[in-house]
């Protein structure tokens, strides 16, 4: 009987072993549960954040989907302490097993399963934990988790076959989610300590490895005391594993928990406006008219031109991977190398902030303080102000959300007028206040906006790009998306057309007010100043003084249709620009990037260079998959470009940009043009040296938000100082290689008036103008 019982036991044991073997084989071959394909095991991490680099090698930021802000780094870029802490804490026999630690597994079964010791530790190896992270869904029950375990064992064994121990460590640390959008050790090190993984201290390493047990439970931001205790447990494990001695433990465990926490967010960092512009630009689809609202026809036309002419526009949907799918900037781990110089970008952001936030905004607030209509012009009626605010309400995210949720117009109206607790932006830091959503819209309209861009006129490389003062609160990009009236900054284009038609800078024109008949209607341009009124003055004087009468006179002698075509050649593609007499004074709306690009023709022998934002793109293995070259077109002849250059240098030396010399002590050769629109709604300044063309716009969100006084609202006050502050910082940095001593390529004996001819001028009165 006893013999038979023993045989039965052996039979049961053998049957159990056989079933285990068969079950293991079934799991191995994917007959039971999910088993990843070999290709998946060989490429277990397939979602990487795209990194955006500056031209000098700095990471400006990343593009990623939620919880996929992962930047993979190799094992040799990790601190040795990081590896030691992980092995000591999570799998002390890591280097001795092949995916499954049977000794630890047996210990866990006895102590946790049989004896019920909750703190006895688990039996999962680092490789098993990696398998769980990569391929197991979150279990909804203990039973489901029980059946997941053998699948993870098989995957762990397979991972050990395909990867070295170092590679498994790297995979684990690169994949783990450390909370706060810090996915992977590189992002975690930057988020919690503002460091690279190889630079982490022992305490910092122990803090991060402590999160591997349960990142939510030991969250260092929410539970610092609990996190510090867990850190010290990791340090104890390192002592136990022989990676440090007791004296070192005593030293490190006594240290406080010190973080340099900064949540990684696409709204933070350097060049935020450029990064968002590039993300949208590269992921754009072929423009379809029906996708654009009726009021945004201009953007449809401009996007269509970009799709046809710019390889970068819609790059992700024009280029495909080996498998035929389009590139995904959120998951493919691309490396986008921009032309931005991180140092110059920093100087540009500082210059914009210093002048707008530090000088203009306080002055604007003082001017508005006694005005009931603030921040709007006191020329507006209450009904007009109400109309502007209501339009902004319907464009707000809150309005769209409430409307989509089915709220009635009356309910939405009441909600926007009910005071609620909110946090609002100030230049001194965010503040908590009680304010209605409608009042908050009006509050934010009181902040002046700005756009700034600097580029190399010969290569097109964009060196600095500032679309606004604070991306979190003012997301609208005033460099590429915003278009405002350009005022007198359009005049160099008009003068260049005159040069192309045989005029010279020394030709004389009547400096007097005249009335023109335009399509049967009388038009009498005004001028801000009356210096040399009634005299015959040279054209170069008219441009230097930004004289409207001289510009109108020139326009009367030229073909407006030809002027519109020339603007197209300069890269100004707004389809709403039509041939008219008043076009000579700049009522058309143009972006900062278009204006800066257009001015490159004056510094580049008549050849306009389009902005070059990206030099190359690499895949996640470092292979170059795209390169980009400057796009150029000849706008005016080299000789006429030199004529324009001499006149625009006169704007600085004897004209409206003279304060560059006497107030900012700017040296060297500089060409420039100021611009101011009606009611001081827009202040422009575009200046260029032989090495850089830089433009700046300052104004309100709406045209009815502006300075009342000309002295404060003109381009020479609003925008010119930003250019000066930026250039002085650039010149002061010897590592950049820019010098005020650089000269324009003009022959020493060049005479811009060599082809001067006699010209007849009409009598003062009314001219009939062709249109």
Model-derived segments and spans:
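Short, glycine/proline-biased beta-turn/loop segments that scaffold the active-site neighborhood
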Residues: 256, 481-536, 610-624
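Non-catalytic structural connector segments
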Residues: 245-339, 343-407
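Active-site SXXK
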Residues: 85-87, 238, 348, 459-460, ...
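Short, well-structured active-site flanking segments
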Residues: 95-105, 183-186, 245-250, 499-519, ...
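A penicillin-recognizing enzyme superfamily signal
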Residues: 338, 342-358, 391-456, 461, ...
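N-terminal type II signal-anchor transmembrane helix
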Residues: 1-53, 93, 113, 359
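Active-site-adjacent helix/loop patches that line small-molecule binding or acyl-intermediate pockets
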Residues: 125-126, 134-136, 141, 145, ...
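Peptidoglycan glycan-strand catalytic modules in the bacterial/periplasmic cell-wall system
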Residues: 10, 46-49, 53-304, 313-316, ...
């Amino acid at each position: 009987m006893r013999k038979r019982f023993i045989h039965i036991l052996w039979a049961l044991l053998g049957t159990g072993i056989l079933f285990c073997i068969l079950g293991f084989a079934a799991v191995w071959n994917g007959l039971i549960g999910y088993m990843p394909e070999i290709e998946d095991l060989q490429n277990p991490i397939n979602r990487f954040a795209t990194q955006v680099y500056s031209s000098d090698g700095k990471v400006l930021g990343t593009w990623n989907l939620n919880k996929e802000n992962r930047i993979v780094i190799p094992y040799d870029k990790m601190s040795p302490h990081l590896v030691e802490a992980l092995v000591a804490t999570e799998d002390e026999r890591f280097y001795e097993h092949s995916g499954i630690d049977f000794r630890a597994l047996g210990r866990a079964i006895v102590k946790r399963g049989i004896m019920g010791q909750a703190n006895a530790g688990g039996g999962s190896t680092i490789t098993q934990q990696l398998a769980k992270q990569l391929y197991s869904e979150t279990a909804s029950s203990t039973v489901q988790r029980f059946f997941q375990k053998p699948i993870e064992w098989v995957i762990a064994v397979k991972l050990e076959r395909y990867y070295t121990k170092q590679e498994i460590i790297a995979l684990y640390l690169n994949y783990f989610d450390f909370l706060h959008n810090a996915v992977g050790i590189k992002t975690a090190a930057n988020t919690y300590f503002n460091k690279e993984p190889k630079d982490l201290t022992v305490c910092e390493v122990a803090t991060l490895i402590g999160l591997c047990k349960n990142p939510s439970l030991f969250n260092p931001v929410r539970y610092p005391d609990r996190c510090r205790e867990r850190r010290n447990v990791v340090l104890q494990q390192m002592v136990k594993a022989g990676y440090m001695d007791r004296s070192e433990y005593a030293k490190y465990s006594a240290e406080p928990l010190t973080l340099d926490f900064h949540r990684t967010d696409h709204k933070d960092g350097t060049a935020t406006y450029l990064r968002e512009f590039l993300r949208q630009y590269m992921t754009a689809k072929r423009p379809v008219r029906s996708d654009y609202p009726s009021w945004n026809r201009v953007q449809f036309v401009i996007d269509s031109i970009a799709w046809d002419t710019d390889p970068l526009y819609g790059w992700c949907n024009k280029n495909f991977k080996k498998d035929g799918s389009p590139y995904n900037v959120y998951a493919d781990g691309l490396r986008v190398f921009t032309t931005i110089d991180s140092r110059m970008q920093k100087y540009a952001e500082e210059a914009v902030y210093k002048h707008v936030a530090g000088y203009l905004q306080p002055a604007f607030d003082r001017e508005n303080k006694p005005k009931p209509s603030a921040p709007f012009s006191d020329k507006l009626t209450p009904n007009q102000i109400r109309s502007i605010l209501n339009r902004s309400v319907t464009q707000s995210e809150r309005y769209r959300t409430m409307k989509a949720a089915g709220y009635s117009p009356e309910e939405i109206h009441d909600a926007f007028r009910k005071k609620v607790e909110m946090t609002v932006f100030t230049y001194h830091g965010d503040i908590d206040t009680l304010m209605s959503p409608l009042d908050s819209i009006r509050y934010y309209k009181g902040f002046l906006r700005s756009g700034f861009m600097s580029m190399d006129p010969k290569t097109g490389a964009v060196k600095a790009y500032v679309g606004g003062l604070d991306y979190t609160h003012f997301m609208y990009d005033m460099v590429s998306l915003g278009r405002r009236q350009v005022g007198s900054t359009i005049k160099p284009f008009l003068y260049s057309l005159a040069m192309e038609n045989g005029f010279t800078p020394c030709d004389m024109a009547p400096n007097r007010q005249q009335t023109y008949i335009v399509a049967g209607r009388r038009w009498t341009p005004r001028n801000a100043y009356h210096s040399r009124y009634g005299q015959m003055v040279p054209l170069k004087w008219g441009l230097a003084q930004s004289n409207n009468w001289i510009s109108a006179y020139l326009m009367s002698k030229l073909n407006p249709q030809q002027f519109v075509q020339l603007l197209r050649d300069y890269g100004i593609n707004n389809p709403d620009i039509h041939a008219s007499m008043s076009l000579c004074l700049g009522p058309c709306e143009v972006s900062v990037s278009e204006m800066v690009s257009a001015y490159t023709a004056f510094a580049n022998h008549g050849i306009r260079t389009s902005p070059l934002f990206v030099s190359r793109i690499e895949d996640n293995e470092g292979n170059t998959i795209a390169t980009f070259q400057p796009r150029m077109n000849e706008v005016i002849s080299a000789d006429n470009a030199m004529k324009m250059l001499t006149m625009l240098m006169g704007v600085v030396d004897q004209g409206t940009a003279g304060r560059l010399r006497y107030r900012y002590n700017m040296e060297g050769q500089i060409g420039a043009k100021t611009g101011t629109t009606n009611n001081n709604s827009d202040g422009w300044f575009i200046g260029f040296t032989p090495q850089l063309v830089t433009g700046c716009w300052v104004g309100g969100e709406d045209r009815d938000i502006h300075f009342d006084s000309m002295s404060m609202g003109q381009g020479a006050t609003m925008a010119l100082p930003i250019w000066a502050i930026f250039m002085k910082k650039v010149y002061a940095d010897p590592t950049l290689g820019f010098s005020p001593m650089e000269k324009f390529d003009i022959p020493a004996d060049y005479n811009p008036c060599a082809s001067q001819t006699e010209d007849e001028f009409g009598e003062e009165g009314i001219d009939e103008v062709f249109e």
